[in-house]
From Swiss-Prot:
The lineage of its organism: Bacteria, Bacillati, Bacillota, Bacilli, Bacillales. GO terms for molecular function: rRNA binding; structural constituent of ribosome. One of its GO terms (cellular component) is ribosome. Belongs to the universal ribosomal protein uS8 family. This is Small ribosomal subunit protein uS8.
Length: 132
């Protein structure tokens, strides 16, 4: 069966694993998911990302990150633009998440970037998700 929203599936897998404090998760790989995972790593939300080659499309292995007392680093994930209702933002309307404490993932003509990077480059695009 085909998946109608692979980004929402990825975010749900991360959210569920984070709630029960799993060390790592594996999910089917795609270029968009790789870009999102790399942004989450660079912003400090996850420890590491590995791409595991298999006979098909490959597997992304994400290593989740927790604080000193096993508190969650990712406190929330929310899918914004969905297949049934796309959400776009102009360069000057890119949203801030929790006044800059979180990030918005924006799909632009220059690839997937954070809200801060989109404002810096003065580009808009599709608001994929919020992470805080």
């Amino acid at each position: 069966m085909t998946m109608s929203d692979p980004i929402a599936d990825m975010l749900t897998r991360v959210r569920n694993a984070n709630m029960v404090r799993h060390e790592k998760i594996e999910l089917p790989a795609s270029n968009i998911k790789k870009q999102i995972a790399e942004i989450l790593k660079s912003e400090g939300f996850i420890k590491n990302v590995e791409f595991v080659e298999d006979d098909k499309q490959g597997v992304l292995r994400l290593f989740l990150k927790y604080g000193q007392n096993n508190e969650r680093v990712i406190t929330g994930l929310k899918r914004i633009s969905k297949p049934g209702l796309r959400v776009y933002a102009k360069a000057d309307e890119v949203p801030k998440v929790l006044n800059g404490l979180g990030i918005a993932l924006v799909s632009t003509s220059e690839g997937i970037v954070t809200d801060r990077e989109a404002r810096k480059r003065n580009v808009g695009g599709e608001v994929l998700a919020y992470v805080w």
